[in-house]
Swiss-Prot record:
PROSITE patterns: RIBOSOMAL_L1
PANTHER family from the UniProt entry: 54S RIBOSOMAL PROTEIN L1, MITOCHONDRIAL, LARGE RIBOSOMAL SUBUNIT PROTEIN UL1M
Keywords: Repressor, Ribonucleoprotein, Ribosomal protein, RNA-binding, rRNA-binding, Translation regulation, tRNA-binding
Biological role stated in the UniProt entry: Binds directly to 23S rRNA. The L1 stalk is quite mobile in the ribosome, and is involved in E site tRNA release. Protein L1 is also a translational repressor protein, it controls the translation of the L11 operon by binding to its mRNA.
Cross-referenced Gene3D superfamilies: 3.30.190.20, 3.40.50.790
UniProt family annotation: Belongs to the universal ribosomal protein uL1 family.
InterPro entries membership: Ribosom_uL1_bac-type, Ribosomal_uL1, Ribosomal_uL1-like, Ribosomal_uL1/biogenesis, Ribosomal_uL1_3-a/b-sand, Ribosomal_uL1_CS
Protein name: Large ribosomal subunit protein uL1
Gene: rplA
GO molecular function: rRNA binding; structural constituent of ribosome; tRNA binding
Organism listed in the record: Aeromonas salmonicida (strain A449)
Subunit description: Part of the 50S ribosomal subunit.
Keyword Glycoprotein tagged: no
UniProt-listed Pfam families: Ribosomal_L1 (PF00687)
Length: 233
């Protein structure tokens, strides 16, 4: 059996895997154990009461976290005309049509989010095999195919997170950085859970949000007692 690192031993001693912690305790624990030499992200895993094998129970969408994600997001927009000027004014780093598609085909993808106006999808559609595997393909369900590209750019810059359940019915996304204060992380989590509850499929029965766990980039997951969120919020 591989020998545990000192860091992992400390984490195992501090985190009780059988316990659900109040949100305040969970965040304090993450901060205490975040000893990496870089500012770690705080991520969340939400187990949903869905059957992920059924397409009508899959959950996908996007929401803007009230305190952002702590990341500088570079945005590329496929559009033209007045929309192109609006996208640039909103802060998009790259704006274009065929010229932007050529950059993507060359592998020059110095961006984190791709947005497209509906009329640009004839160009973007040719890039599916490149953008799709990277999770960058624009989609109307998450607001990245839209006639209002300026608003989409502003949302991306403001800290919008996209979510989609995996094959096990779990949502994985980010809540911010471990340098955020307790209130910021708590409010970001509550905002995400509100968005998920609104996205509950009508065919999903029983308890929808079954388990919530938060973790840092290099840390273990800490289960959160949902009652502590409701009691404090």
């Amino acid at each position: 059996m591989a020998k545990l690192s000192k860091r992992m031993r400390v984490i195992r001693e501090k985190v009780d895997g059988t316990k659900e912690y109040s949100i305040n305790e969970a965040i304090a624990l993450l901060k205490e154990l975040a000893t990496a030499k870089f500012v770690e992200s705080v991520d969340v895993a939400v187990n949903l009461g869905i059957d992920a094998r059924k397409s009508d129970q899959n959950v996908r969408g996007a929401t803007v976290l009230p305190h952002g994600t702590g990341r500088d997001v570079r945005v590329a927009v496929f559009t033209q005309g007045a929309n192109a000027e609006a996208a640039k004014a909103a802060g998009a780093e790259l704006v274009g049509m065929d010229d932007l598609a050529d950059l993507v085909k060359k592998g020059e993808m110095n961006f984190d989010v791709v947005i497209a106006s509906p009329d640009a999808m004839r160009v973007v559609g040719q890039l599916g095999q490149i953008l799709g595997p990277r999770g960058l393909m624009p989609n109307p369900k998450v607001g990245t195919v839209t006639p209002n590209v300026a608003e989409a750019v502003k949302n991306a810059k403001a800290g919008q997170v996209r979510y989609r359940n995996d094959k096990n019915g779990i949502i994985h996304t980010t809540l911010g950085k471990v340098s955020f204060d307790e209130v910021q992380l708590k409010e970001n989590l509550e905002s995400l859970l509100v968005a998920l509850k609104k996205a509950k499929p009508s065919s999903a029965k029983g308890i929808f949000i079954k388990k919530v766990s938060i973790s840092t980039t290099m840390g273990a997951g800490v289960a959160v007692d949902q009652a502590s969120l409701e009691a404090q919020g």
